[in-house]
Curated annotation (Swiss-Prot):
It comes from Chromohalobacter salexigens (strain ATCC BAA-138 / DSM 3043 / CIP 106854 / NCIMB 13768 / 1H11). The gene is ureB. It holds the Pfam family Urease_beta. This is Urease subunit beta. InterPro entries: Urease_beta-like, Urease_betasu_sf, Urease_subunit. The lineage of its organism: Bacteria, Pseudomonadati, Pseudomonadota, Gammaproteobacteria, Oceanospirillales. The keyword Isomerase does not apply. Its EC number is 3.5.1.5. One of its GO terms (cellular component) is urease complex. It is an enzyme of class 3 (hydrolase). CDD domains: Urease_beta. It catalyses: urea + 2 H2O + H(+) = hydrogencarbonate + 2 NH4(+). NCBIfam families: PRK13203.1, urease_beta.
Length: 108
């Protein structure tokens, strides 16, 4: 092996295999593009994006880590989301959760 060399497996690699997935339609009603990153808590996305926020609580984009999806002004599209896993604690973003996603009485 050469330092820094990649040894890749042949074929396709499925990201997040076996995870529950949901699809939501999203519309950008703003006048500027909006980009959402791979691990952003989707329910807390820019208010100019119109979609069912309650349905997306605890979910993030089903895209490769470090990538994003861009919504152009006036654009409407479907996106696939997957749930956060692990401890399911969310902090920051727009500060709508600030703790455990599954906590009783928690709102976003």
């Amino acid at each position: 092996m050469i330092p820094g060399e990649y040894q890749l497996q042949d074929g396709e690699i499925e990201l997040c295999a076996g995870r529950e997935r949901i699809t939501v339609e999203v519309a950008n009603t703003g006048d500027r593009p909006i980009q959402i990153g791979s691990h952003y808590h989707f329910a807390e996305a820019n208010p100019a994006l119109i979609f069912d926020r309650d349905k997306t609580r605890g979910y993030r984009l089903d895209v490769a880590a470090g990538t994003a999806i861009r919504f152009e002004p006036g654009q409407r599209r479907e996106v696939t989301l997957i749930p956060f896993v692990g401890r399911r604690h969310v902090y920051g973003f727009r500060q709508a959760v600030m703790g455990a996603l599954d906590e009783k009485g928690a709102t976003s």
